[in-house]
Amino acid sequence: MKMSDEALKIIEESQNREKLKQVIDLIEERLVEHAIVPTELQWTILINHLNEMLKRSQRKETIPVVDRDLFKEVSKEAITISDEIVRSIGNLTDDEIYVLSIHFET
């Protein structure tokens, strides 16, 4: 996947660089499986989001509770990918699954 200089900078400056790279690799595999091809901008936004998720996981912080009804139109595939990513990061609430899922909608 082609990444912007900004995305590469986020990765390079991440306090969780190795874990971030692992999560990105996992996402790349899932995107290929589901024929999802993000733009450079979408990748940059996603990588920034993942970096923030890793920080929250490490600091044991949570996001505000989300209304899951707002995500009822999100595909099962997007939710499944998100669930796997949230579980692989660990120490995050299920609300993260729904917020992350929008990155995988086509």
Named regions from a protein language model:
Residues 1-106:
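A cross-family "folded-core" feature that marks the main globular domain of proteins
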